[in-house]
Amino acid sequence: MNYQDFISEQTEYYHLPVPFELEGGGVLTGVQVAYRTWGKLNSAGDNGVLICHALTGSADADEWWEGLLGANKALDSDRDFIICSNILGSCYGTTGATSINPQTGIPYGASFPAITIRDMVRLQAALIQHLGIKSLQLVIGGSLGGMQVLEWALLYPEIVQAIAPIATSGRHSAWCIGLSEAQRQAIYADPNWKGGNYTKEQPPSQGLAVARMMAMSAYRSWQSFTARFGRQYDAVADQFAIASYLQHHGQKLVQRFDANTYITLTQAMDSHDVAQGRDYKSVLQSIKQPALVVAIDSDILYPPTEQQELADFIPDAQLGWLQSSYGHDAFLIDIATLSQLVINFRQSLSLKTFSDVTT
């Protein structure tokens, strides 16, 4: 599998000039970051907007969040300098399990070290510094992207002016960890897994496909599956329509994603806890930036109680809602509603800034 085929031609690359130390104690050398930008950085370097992508996403935010960014949109490329980088550990251009290990000359594979959400954010910060960005007007992202958003607020308060964590939590729940582990076990059970030391020609495709089927079931909702499929039967495939749908999405992921990468990133998500041994409420209360926390009423993966908790504990937070039957994936589907939430939030920030200046 050549994952370069799924990276746009507009993608740029930054090569970290120094070794990158991981939170767990490991060190990566020759780290590469794949990223995209839209708009222009102003002379003050303070019009940055950072998009953080989810589990199987890439730096090509104009493809998976097309309605949210562009000229005169919520993330306005006429006004903002918008950045989206492929996260550490992914397979779309940034150093990860499919990358060549400079110490061995072969892909890392199963030897790629454990990483955390903080590691992802710290590497993004190195890119932001390289690009000459002095201030990020907004850091925004959903799901795994939302976890990065929260860590950005905590790690770099001097850079981040506002945040929008969407359909996410401050720490991964037992529910999410359990679902992730079941997906990983599906991959491990594939005969081609071989402890993660599989070949490019014979990856654990069936295991990864089943993992994706499990994930898709959690990304949607009872309402959406019932309304779309009910008990429809696919006579050609001789199975229920919902089975055909899930199998289709499983096979789609196999064509574009790597199993070791899936393991690495889901384990990083499971490690997510903004407190890390500190008092959870106090850590969230230390976030000083204005925050738009977005909840999805039908999300069974990161239920609204988790976003309500964030909005309750972050001092300057407001809770926005996506009323949708699409479940967790609504933040990638109901773009019109999400766009309006972001537009309203950014307008409120402008009004607040004007008020602060004139009073």
From Swiss-Prot:
GO terms for molecular function: homoserine O-acetyltransferase activity. Residues 49-332 form the AB hydrolase-1 domain. The keyword ATP-binding does not apply. Keywords: Acyltransferase, Amino-acid biosynthesis, Cytoplasm, Methionine biosynthesis, Transferase. Its EC number is 2.3.1.31. It is found in: Cytoplasm. One of its GO terms (cellular component) is cytoplasm. The keyword Hydrolase does not apply. InterPro entries: AB_hydrolase_1, AB_hydrolase_fold, HAT_MetX-like. It catalyses: L-homoserine + acetyl-CoA = O-acetyl-L-homoserine + CoA. Substrate binds at residues 212, 329. GO terms for biological process: homoserine metabolic process; methionine biosynthetic process. Pathway: Amino-acid biosynthesis; L-methionine biosynthesis via de novo pathway; O-acetyl-L-homoserine from L-homoserine: step 1/1. The active site is at residues 143, 299, 328. It holds the Pfam family Abhydrolase_1. Belongs to the AB hydrolase superfamily. MetX family. NCBIfam families: homoserO_Ac_trn, PRK00175.1. Transfers an acetyl group from acetyl-CoA to L-homoserine, forming acetyl-L-homoserine. Homodimer. This is Homoserine O-acetyltransferase. The gene is metXA.
